[in-house]
Amino acid sequence: MFCFLGLRLLKYITFRTAYATIFAFLLALIFGPFIISRLKKLKLDQILRKDGPKHHLSEKMGIPTMGGVLIFFCVLVSLFFWIHFFNIYFLIVLFVMVSFACLGFTDDLLKIKRKNSDGLNPKFKIYGQILFSFISVVMLYYFGGEHVSILYFPFFKSLKLDLGILYIPFGMFVLISASNSFNLTDGLDGLAIGLSIVVIGALIIIAYLTSRVDFALYLNIPNVKGCEELVIFLGALLGGSFGFLWFNAYPAKIMMGDTGSLSIGAVLGMVALILKSEILFAILAGVFVVETLSVIIQVVVYKKTKKRVFKMAPLHHHFEELGWSEMQVVIRFWIIGLIFAILALSTIKIR
């Protein structure tokens, strides 16, 4: 595809990444209003938690969900022009994106059909996540190259651990945890997608450094051959996410839904696995980790003591209950997410 165009610029990863990003963003701006209107006509409105903040019931009623459809449409169309499709890492990530998006889409659809926030049976939901994560991690394990099962630790120059076949359950844990943590964080206008943009931006830098032999040697990080196409994929995802944020910013005209949040979380988890940045990813996605821990702590403590640690979980609702406005919570969480990203990127050199 790139040869017959005869443009040398198309050989450069930075050029293709930049235009994949811009293209996906512009597609979102162009098709966003149409997709939002179609979702409204189909009455695919966000179903709100009855035990959530009371003001959400009036402010967010009637907003269409399944916004992940907009993101992934823009990403896939953009990638058609800018990526080498037959790259094994891209194909694995594409499988993760489509499979988890389908799972989230089913969950969203059932919520709308039943008119409650229960959606897909939790057992079926986790079974689906286990199945899709198992398939994708096994694919990575067998096609991922010599470093695939090795775990690298930030801050340490030579500390690493070869998990062998145990890398498969470990990788599944990363994917499922990332998917669910991004899903839990998607509770306020612009919150999850804004934090996702920060994580995606940092992963673009890591992917580019990891794809280059010279940078990998200089920084003492693994060089993953073939991962340069992930830079372009992440660029398209970044552009699509910025475009979605255009319509998801407060007051939101569209919600991401499980269609978007489950899939984006899983995709970024898989990218972290491919780039050998699993532990770094936990720092990078620090806000998502804290949000998930707040839910776990709330549930465990309440079951044992019948007392609540937080006024409401996940953590972003706790701050709403303390009197913070929605925009204050979102922007402050974005700032914290950016600090986590800077911290994570700084560890690349500190080895």
Curated annotation (Swiss-Prot):
BP terms from Gene Ontology:
cell division; cell wall organization; peptidoglycan biosynthetic process; regulation of cell shape
Give the transmembrane region(s).
17-37, 61-83, 88-105, 130-150, 158-178, 190-210, 230-250, 254-274, 279-299, 328-348
Q: What is its main location?
A: membrane
The biological pathway it contributes to is: Cell wall biogenesis; peptidoglycan biosynthesis
* One GO MF term attached to the UniProt entry: phospho-N-acetylmuramoyl-pentapeptide-transferase activity
Membrane topology is: Multi-pass membrane protein
* Main EC class the enzyme belongs to: transferase
Question: Which cofactor does this sequence's record say it needs?
Answer: Mg(2+)
Instruction: List the protein's name.
Output: Phospho-N-acetylmuramoyl-pentapeptide-transferase
